[in-house]
Curated annotation (Swiss-Prot):
SUPFAM superfamilies: Multidrug efflux transporter AcrB pore domain, PN1, PN2, PC1 and PC2 subdomains, Multidrug efflux transporter AcrB TolC docking domain, DN and DC subdomains, Multidrug efflux transporter AcrB transmembrane domain. InterPro entries: AcrB_DN_DC_subdom, Acrflvin-R, Multidrug-R_MdtB. The keyword Isomerase does not apply. The chain crosses the membrane at residues 16-36, 342-362, 369-389, 396-416, 440-460, 472-492, 537-557, 869-889, 890-910, 911-931, 968-988, 998-1018. GO terms for cellular component: plasma membrane. One of its GO terms (molecular function) is xenobiotic transmembrane transporter activity. This is Multidrug resistance protein MdtB. It is found in: Cell inner membrane. Keywords: Cell inner membrane, Cell membrane, Membrane, Transmembrane, Transmembrane helix, Transport. Coiled coil: none annotated. It is a multi-pass membrane protein. It comes from Enterobacter sp. (strain 638).
């Protein structure tokens, strides 16, 4: 029977050691709660930290960019600008379309923003053109966020107009109703319509005008209330044949009489069933298709949204005819799942490596099982808290848990090693557990809270980066906290029941060999430590040298924002000369598609040409290139992009800009490249002067590639200069002129055909195939006040000018965005610096403002906050350690280890060719918390030896270093192996995980070597300093 130690022995662990059943059941409860929590955790690529963003689209077919800007965009902007919580407003006004993108503060709920946007639209309604086909439509979507799913709908038996009609009514509307879906767009422009192509010569010969015919059509096709008859016994509803439904009916419409004979619409026009907009087209690979892009609402979970769509797709496809084919061309969740799966594998590998290193050091199966139980218990228990906090299983939280495998085992190792030491001295297991756990309890608390203190500044980081890493920091802190609880409860209880002197003495060939190796290493360390302690100033010089080297490396290392991921999807923009026609642009797009589809890494391609609110001009085409899975291709996305751009460069008359799709989208504008720099001015004239100069200068910089701007002011325009005096004498107003031109060349939507399921338009235009180019203007006729027919040329002259293809605004002022990529051999930090230097050399006038946008702006903010973040982490840790040790000096000794971690991390990043990005910075902050544990374990034992055994400071710290050498080495190796799978990651999303692993492994290796020698030297130097201070101010010490 064991004699129990006094009740004061064991500290907070005593209750749990003495009550093994209660302790076991408590741990089982934590395990079950974590398992249940895991089942309820959603899966995503990253924490949902999107800015609340709303896009407002207004279509005005036939209107020039100038008209769209002044008549639609400006009135809307004035109303939107009054909304509270608005962070940024950008707009793009192109031919026939206005797109306003509103980005709100992170703190504003999206539903509240939606209400404000609707109220602003209502307030602006009276200021908008009365002939708008439809009022402004808003969507809760970020236009820069790539689609979560892309589907292609094709048919070899049905016309595309019929296919789109069915897809819109039977598929798109149902998908739009799915929770999390922000916008479903159908690209391809094949919406059914009745097209009326006027024969200008026939109209002129009959003495008619387009306005006469338009009025006749509008009057002949109506759908309005007619009332009812209410008799004595029954009521009768009135109806009439006031609607015309087909092209045949319109063809027979009488538009005028001449000499008593009717003139039918078919006599003066070609009337046909066609598409509402003939300047739109989409293709899937090489086949014409209706392309359906599904975008999520900001903040919606991608996996849940895509799963809901996938679940309903079979039923939706079943509702379509057999001749209609629906194919999912891209699904972002495929790569997200693969990335999360790879991270989960790395988590399991880290756990296995940590358990392996524990066995190597402890050389005992029962002693290995105890910390091996602590690892999954701490990690699984974290899931329960994650559910409560509304977190998700994503790359960052899984990275936190992977890193935590090395942390959570530290506490258990320290406890086991201390208890084992007492058992080996002859203590009974129960007494050893009580004594060892009580002795080490303060050290565990110090390790835990000082490590959590490092994470506190991450919780207070502002803007989107802070939101992004909040889940990472909290997840890691919770895992560490649970591990501390497990180490002070379950671990000593298991030690008391599973460890014994016999089991610890039991050795095999491996354990004996490893023991001899450790003894030789410890002996060699002791000899080296003796020499180091004899040369304190040289050692101090090394410590100061690491600090200076850390600062130098921090200055010179290339800096980035967020690693560029290979998600298997490439977004592309094809650019042609500004005067290109739709037909020519479609031909060029097909030529580029031929080249792209030949690449062995490409699986599928969707492309789109035309202006519809998502594409700004006819000389632009949008492409989405879907690559084969990473395992099925030889090259990563950057290599594929370089290869595709080189191949497409041989196609004449086009420029191709490509960028890989990323999980983190901060931008709100659809850009040609990864990064943007914006110029804002009070007038378009100022931009036209300075933008070309800056673009030319930036294109010369080696730090930038793919430099281009969205400034397009060389579109061809025909300026109709009306002689107002002549027009007035003839009784022709400017409204008459505009109407005549709009009827002829605007694809004017003049009437609506109503059906039970949908509404279709009647489109009016001149048949420009008969009179192409500017000569078509000669066919325009107007009616004078006397009823005579007047050709446009009688009252106006036409001159050809250059005009903008689109007009962009940023916060209501004219702006232009310069897009650029960064070559592989340069960093984003170097690119930003080169742009700012180029801007200084041009000496812009005061009315031009510049700023970076999107991820580049976030990079600047993150870089500016990094130093303060590290300082805050150090200060937080100093405060916690000062409180725990009740000392101003000992925390400084502990924190003196930090420069060694910085040197190792920065060197590792530079040698591996990695940038110092936000992921790597998080790793360095974690290192601040890890490396100080070596000093804590040394100083705790040294202080105890001085206090309890009366040892001299040098003897105490020397003994502490030797006694704690093995657990220090063990815990460092555990943390290193926990980070090793991240460093060696090669799967999907590896770009995101690797910088964290590289920085931590490098920092741990260097700090492990240096802190074993610098910490005891600095401890003694501060002790000497303290003694001198006491001798110099004895009275103050006595009073204190």
């Amino acid at each position: 029977m064991q004699v129990l130690p006094p009740s004061s022995t064991g500290g907070p662990s005593r209750l749990f050691i003495m009550r093994p059943v209660a302790t076991t059941l408590l741990m089982v409860a934590i395990l079950i709660a974590g398992i249940i929590g895991y089942r309820f955790l959603p899966v995503s690529a990253l924490p949902e930290v999107d800015y609340p963003t709303i896009q407002v689209i207004t279509l005005y077919p036939g209107a020039s960019p100038d008209v769209v800007t002044s008549a639609i965009t400006a009135p809307l902007e004035r109303q939107f600008g009054q909304m509270s919580g608005l962070k940024q407003m950008s707009s793009q006004s192109s031919g026939g379309a206005s797109v306003v993108t509103l980005q709100f503060q992170l703190t504003l709920p999206l539903d509240v923003a939606e209400q404000e946007v609707q109220a602003a639209i209502n307030a602006a309604t009276n200021l908008l053109p009365s002939d708008l086909p439809n009022p402004p439509v808003y969507s809760k979507v970020n236009p820069a966020d790539p689609p979560i799913m892309t589907l292609a709908v094709t048919s070899s038996a049905m016309p595309m107009t019929q296919v789109e009609d069915m897809v819109e009514t039977r598929v798109a509307q149902k998908i739009s109703q799915v929770s999390g879906v922000g916008l479903v767009t159908l690209s391809g422009g094949q919406r059914p319509a009745v097209r009326v192509k006027l024969n200008a010569q026939a109209i002129a010969a009959l003495g008619l005008t387009s306005e006469t015919i338009r009025t006749a059509i509008v009057s002949a096709n109506v759908n309005s209330a007619k009332g009812s008859l209410d008799g004595p016994t029954r009521a009768v509803t009135l109806s009439a044949n006031d609607q015309m439904q087909s092209a045949d009916e319109y063809r027979q419409l009488i538009v005028a009489y001449q000499n008593g004979a009717p003139i039918r619409l078919g006599d003066v026009a070609t009337v046909e069933q066609g598409a509402e907009n003939r300047w739109l087209g989409a293709w899937a690979n090489k086949e014409q298709a209706i392309v359906m892009n599904v975008q999520r609402q900001p903040g919606a979970n991608i996996i849940d949204t895509a799963d809901s769509i996938r679940a309903m797709l079979p039923q939706l496809i079943e509702s379509l005819p057999k001749s209609v084919n629906v194919k999912v061309l891209s699904d972002r969740t495929t790569n997200i799942r693969a990335s999360v799966s790879d991270t989960q594998f790395e988590l399991m590998l880290a756990m296995a490596l940590v358990v392996m290193i524990i066995y190597v050091f402890l050389r005992n199966v029962p002693a290995t099982i105890i910390p091996a139980v602590a690892v999954p218990l701490s990690l699984v228990g974290t899931f329960a808290v994650m559910v409560f906090l509304d977190f998700s299983i994503n790359n960052l939280t899984l990275m936190a848990l992977t890193i935590a495998t090395g942390f959570v085992v530290d506490d258990a190792i320290v406890v086991i090693e201390n208890i084992s030491r007492y058992i080996e001295k002859g203590e009974k297991p129960l007494a050893a557990a009580l004594k060892g756990a009580g002795e080490i309890g303060f050290t565990i608390i110090s390790l835990t809270f000082s490590l959590i203190a490092v994470l506190i500044p991450l919780l207070f980081m502002g803007d989107i980066v802070g939101r992004l890493f909040r889940e990472f920091a909290v997840t890691l802190a919770v895992a560490i906290l649970i591990s501390a609880v497990v180490s002070l409860t379950l671990t000593p209880m298991m030690c008391a029941r599973m460890l014994s002197a016999e089991s610890l003495r039991k050795q095999n060939r491996f354990s004996r060999a490893s023991e001899r190796m450790f003894e030789r290493i410890i002996a060699a360390y002791g000899r080296m430590l003796e020499k180091v302690l004899n040369h304190p100033w040289a050692t101090l010089s090394v410590a100061l040298g690491t600090l200076a080297l850390s600062v130098m490396l921090w200055i010179v290392i290339p800096k980035g924002f967020f690693p560029i991921q290979d998600n298997g999807i490439i977004q592309g923009t094809l650019q042609a000369p500004q005067s290109v026609s739709f037909a020519s642009m479609a031909q060029r797009q097909q030529a580029v598609s031929d080249v792209i589809m030949k690449d062995p890494a490409v699986e599928s391609l969707t492309s789109f040409v035309g202006v519809d609110g998502t594409n700004p001009s006819l000389n632009s085409a949008r492409l989405q290139i879907n690559l084969k899975p990473l395992d099925d291709r030889d090259d990563r996305v950057n290599t594929v992009i370089e290869r595709l751009q080189s191949a497409v460069a041989k196609v004449p008359g086009v420029e191709l800009y490509l960028q890989p799709t990323q999980d983190l989208t901060i931008d709100t504008t659809v850009s040609r490249t990864q990064y943007q720099f914006t110029l804002q001015a009070t007038s378009l004239e100022a931009l036209s002067t300075w933008v070309p100069q800056l673009v030319t200068k930036l294109q010369e910089l080696p730090q930038l590639s793919d430099v281009s701007s969205d400034w397009q002011d060389k579109g061809l325009a025909a300026y109709v200069n009306v002689n107002r005096d002549t027009a007035s004498r003839l009784g022709i107003s400017m409204a008459d002129v505009d109407n005549a031109l709009y009827n002829a060349f605007g694809q004017r939507l003049i009437s609506t055909i109503y059906t039970q399921a949908n509404q279709y338009r009647v489109v009016l235009e001149h048949n420009t195939e008969q009179t192409p180019g500017l000569t078509a203007l000669d066919t325009v006729r107007l009616t004078s006040k006397n009823g005579g027919i007047v050709p446009l040329s009688a009252i106006a002259t036409v001159e050809q000018r250059f005009a903008p293809l689109s007009i962009n605004h940023l916060d209501q002022f004219p702006s232009t965005t310069i897009s650029f990529n960064v070559p592989d051999n340069y960093s984003l930090g170097e690119a930003v610096e080169s742009i700012l230097n180029a801007e200084k050399t041009l000496n812009f006038p005061t009315d031009i403002q510049t700023q970076f946008q999107g991820s580049t702006l976030a990079f600047q903010a993150a870089l500016g906050n990094t130093i303060w973040l590290i300082v805050a982490a150090v200060v937080a840790m100093y405060i916690v350690l000062g409180v725990l040790y009740e000392s101003f000096i000992h925390p400084v000794t502990i924190l003196s280890t930090l420069p060694t971690a910085g040197v190792g991390a920065l060197l590792a990043l530079m040698l591996s060719g990695s940038e110092l990005d936000v992921i790597a910075i998080i790793g360095i902050i974690l290192l601040i918390g890890i490396v100080k544990k070596n000093a804590i374990m040394m100083i705790d034992f040294a202080l105890a030896a001085e206090r309890e055994q009366g040892m001299a400071p040098r003897d105490a710290i020397f003994q502490a270093c030797l006694l704690r050498f093995r657990p220090i080495l063990m815990t460092t190796m555990a943390a290193l192996l926990g980070a090793l799978p991240l460093m060696l990651s090669t799967g999907v999303g590896a770009e995101l995980r690797r910088p964290l692993g590289i920085g931590m492994v490098g920092g741990l290796l260097v700090s492990q070597v240096l802190t074993l020698f610098t910490t005891p030297v600095i401890y003694l130097l501060f002790d000497t300093l303290a003694l001198k201070m006491k001798a110099r101010f004895p009275k103050r010490e006595e009073e204190a």
